[in-house]
């Protein structure tokens, strides 16, 4: 039995493209119905709906290379990506969060996303829009925290 995509001679859309298509459809529906449009909901650079960009190339290249010590090798420390034990005197990459990875495991990961596979600590990116989004998100979080503190101080 042929798949839906084969029968209709089309390809599945990626999540980013699907988000854009949905936003455009919603815009068209609103225009057809003569409704007020909230322009904020049609921001096509909405990073809450998209995958983060790759880590900055300069940051990835500057990740420290660490040599596995005999103690670490004896403990059976493993690469969290491939699950192979590190060997004594093996060169591995250390993330800012201190997690260790084989170079061949972590570099492809960081070419797709900007975070540690274990703890999700984010590295800087080369995408100015995403960096601005992160700053704005942090400002909103701080503002909410200050508001909670103020509210708590009023009622204690």
UniProtKB/Swiss-Prot annotation:
Question: Per the UniProt record, which EC number(s) apply here?
Answer: 2.3.2.27
Q: Which keywords, in A-to-Z order, does the entry hold?
A: Metal-binding, Transferase, Ubl conjugation pathway, Zinc, Zinc-finger
| PROSITE patterns registered for this protein in UniProt | ZF_RING_2
State if Zinc-finger is listed as a keyword.
Answer: yes
Provide the disulphide bond pattern.
none
Give the EC class as a word: transferase
**What does this protein's UniProt record list under function?**
E3 ubiquitin-protein ligase which accepts ubiquitin from an E2 ubiquitin-conjugating enzyme in the form of a thioester and then directly transfers the ubiquitin to targeted substrates. Catalyzes monoubiquitination of 26S proteasome subunit PSMC2/RPT1.
Q: What is this protein called?
A: E3 ubiquitin-protein ligase RNF181
């Amino acid at each position: 039995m042929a798949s839906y995509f084969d029968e209709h001679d089309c390809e599945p859309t990626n999540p980013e493209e699907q988000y854009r298509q949905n936003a455009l459809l919603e815009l068209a529906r609103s225009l057809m119905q003569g409704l007020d449009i909230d322009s904020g909901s049609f921001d096509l650079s909405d990073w809450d709906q998209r995958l983060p960009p790759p880590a900055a190339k300069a940051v990835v290249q500057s990740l420290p290379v660490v040599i596995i010590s005999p103690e670490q090798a004896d403990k059976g420390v493993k690469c969290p990506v491939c699950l192979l034990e590190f060997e004594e005197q093996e060169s591995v990459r250390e993330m800012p969060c201190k997690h260790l990875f084989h170079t061949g495991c972590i570099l492809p990961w960081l070419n797709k996303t900007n975070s540690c596979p274990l703890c999700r600590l984010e590295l800087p990116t080369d995408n100015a829009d995403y960096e601005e989004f992160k700053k704005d998100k942090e400002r909103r979080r701080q503002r909410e925290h200050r508001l909670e503190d103020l509210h708590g101080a009023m009622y204690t």
